[in-house]
Structure formats: structure tokens, C-alpha cells
Design a protein with these regions (language model features):
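Conserved SDR Rossmann-fold cofactor-binding beta-strand/turn motif
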Residues: 11-17, 21, 63, 76-78
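Short C-terminal tail/terminal secondary-structure segment
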Residues: 60, 71-87
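Short, small/polar-rich loop/turn modules that mediate ligand/substrate recognition or access, typified
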Residues: 6, 11, 70-72
């Protein structure tokens, strides 16, 4: 898609989020939510789950002129989980 629209100066990117503190995640958890978030965070290399504003900050950057040469990219925002999985390949 990025190649299809590049000549029109339309940039195409995707944000691929990991575990984030959202109502969807909260509603899917049983038991103590904060305890669950801590356990999930401990599994992440960065030591916590993400906050919604971190996705917003990335989206704002990608939509800005500062990212004007970026197209056809996937931005993984997952606290290092993908990097962790690559260690085991």
C-alpha cells in the first residue's frame, strides 16, 4: 500500500502495540488488576506495560513533518518483547 500511494505523497505506516494499560486489557484480567499488570510488566525487558499516551506520542511523530521520509514501516511498541523473542531464534 505504501508503494501504491507514495507518488501522491501519502505515507502508510502501522503501529503494532504490545501490552498496554487499556480498558480492553483491564476487562480481560481476572483478580487484582494492578497485580496482573505488575506480573505482565515483569515479563517485559523494559519492566512494565505501556501507557496509552506512548502510542499517541508515536502516532503524533509518524504524522508529523519530522517523519516525512518514513513510509511502509511497522513500528513495534512492545517494551522490548519482540527483541526478546529474537534472542531465541
Amino acid at each position: 500500500m505504501a508503494l501504491d500511494y507514495a507518488k501522491e505523497q501519502i505515507r502508510v505506516m502501522a503501529i503494532c502495540p504490545g501490552a498496554f494499560n487499556t480498558p480492553l486489557l483491564r476487562n480481560s484480567m481476572a483478580g487484582d488488576i494492578e497485580e496482573g499488570f505488575k506480573a505482565m510488566g515483569d515479563a517485559h525487558p523494559i519492566g512494565r506495560i505501556g501507557q496509552p499516551d506512548e502510542i499517541g506520542n508515536a502516532a503524533s511523530f509518524l504524522c508529523s513533518d519530522k517523519a516525512s521520509f518514513i513510509t511502509g514501516e511497522y513500528l513495534v511498541i512492545d517494551g522490548g518483547m519482540m527483541a526478546l523473542s529474537l534472542i531465541h531464534i
